[in-house]
Amino acid sequence: MTHNFLLKASLLYKDICPEQSRFLLQRHQSTAAALPQSIICPFCFEWRKLGNHHVRLRPKRKPTARIRRLLKRESAGKRLSAEQTAVLQKFKRASNAMMATCHTCNKVSRQPGMNRELLVSLSKHKSTPGSASKHRTPQTVNWATPKSVANRTPSSTPRSASSNTSSSSSSKSSSVKSSPFARLKKILMLENKQQGKKGGLKDFLSSL
């Protein structure tokens, strides 16, 4: 039987007959390349699916007082002995682990995760604000800071423009304020003119 046939047959019997599926998968694992532990149990060869296993994350061990002292000595550039270096390397290479408990065989499989050295190297390769500014093209720089805006300073702006704007604004405000008084003045002048015309007509009639 070929490896591909064993794998497909195991997948076919996964829900119909789990015992037959585990037997076929065991034959496949013993003769072909092993499948990862994230999809099968390495002990009973049960396909992992929702409800047939329990997963928990085991964190990295915390640094002790001795390891904290060694880390301070290393950051200060002091020389460490061979034993101290080995202890420090063991701490840096420690990683978290994913613990999966199979409900069929009740055995726990351990899958290692990332260690501290890998996390430090990944953090160093991340982009920084300086590197982001280096990758900016000249076009984006020109768009971000136009010359007309960048060259304008408070000292270079003409004072006449500011004075004109202030005078125009003051004239507008004064015209708005004095408009009711101007209308009232015009009304009074019209009344005086009308009264003057009436008096002239009386004088003319009396003279006749």
Swiss-Prot record:
Residues 123-180, 189-208 are annotated as: Disordered. Residues 153-180 have a biased composition (Low complexity). It comes from the Eukaryota. Residues 123-137 have a biased composition (Basic residues). It holds the Pfam family DUF4674. Residues 138-152 have a biased composition (Polar residues). Belongs to the UPF0711 family. This is UPF0711 protein C18orf21 homolog. The lineage of its organism: Eukaryota, Metazoa, Chordata, Craniata, Vertebrata.
